[in-house]
Amino acid sequence: LALYFAGIMMVLLSTVTNLSNVSRLFQVLLPFSFNFLDQTLNLFVGFLLLGLARGISMKVKKAYWPTIILLGFCIVNTVARTTSWQLIAVYAVILLAVILARKEFYREKFVYSWGALTVDSILFGCLFIGYAVAGYYAARPAGGNQVINHFLLFPSDDVWFNGLIGLSISLIGLFFLYQYLAETTVTLGEGFEEARLTRFLEKFGGNEGSQFLYLKDYGHFYYQEEGEDQVLFGFQMKFNKCFVLADPIGQREKWTAATLAFMDQADLLGYQLVFYRISEEYVMNLHDCGFEFMKVGEEGLIQFEIGRAHV
């Protein structure tokens, strides 16, 4: 939350440069926010803080050191321009909190969820719209409408244009930051290996969804013991969700251990497992593993009687 606050404050104060002069709330909050002399640097650092806050909230290991370095840079820059021991104490607490939480960061990569993507899209979309509106009124003052002028006008068109450049650079930097956080050599499960899959199905048999596992857009997670494949899951990836098709294939007595191993590996990479088209027996197994479940649709069986055709 502290990182989100710092990032949003820096972006807001750089986007609407006189915001602290027209709002008592921001007059109170301004002394507790990072602030640089350069508007472009304010925007750039603000967006990086927002991006790292997202990574920290998802407990991504690779977000830890960039956050420490960026916070240290912000603190040194700000403290060099202030003598407020109260402010220094607040910054020290924020930095200490991140350091003490370092063991909480265990995920190998950053993966966007639908919810996080929606929130960030709304945040950045509102920022762009607000900046465009501010630029419009900066170029065409709103006549006698002192309220609009008071809130949205920049000191000059140059200030607005410099901010626009900073905004563009910041979004590019944010894109590369997300790319960095999302890169990893660790993968979930295995790719399509026809010989291995066929050998496994011949040994343990299949289920109602096993024919789909030969489609190359499915991934395969093999649970092994002593180097031998024991249980198989077939899945597809959608954002941060891993949709697992039907019951596991393999030794039933090892389903629970295999499911827990699959959960741990998926969580390590930032994915959440979603099971569908599964049996009642496996539903209870998943419930014991901590999953919630809901029933959608019904399964029906029809017996067709063979007889003379009717015209």
Each PLM stretch: what is its role?
Residues 309-311:
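Conserved small/polar residues in nucleotide/adenosyl-binding loops
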Residues 147-148, 154-160, 180-243:
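N-terminal topogenic membrane-targeting module
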Residues 1-190:
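Topology signature of small-to-medium multi-pass alpha-helical membrane proteins
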Residues 182-188, 300-307:
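Charged, low-complexity surface segments at secondary-structure and domain boundaries
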Residues 213-306:
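Conserved donor-binding loop and adjoining core beta-sheet/short helix segment
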Residues 54-55, 210, 264:
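Surface-exposed charged/polar residues within alpha-helices that form helix-capping/stabilizing sites
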Residues 12-18, 184, 204-211, 269, ...:
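Short secondary-structure junctions and interdomain/linker hinges
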Residues 10, 196-199, 281:
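Exposed alpha-helical structural elements
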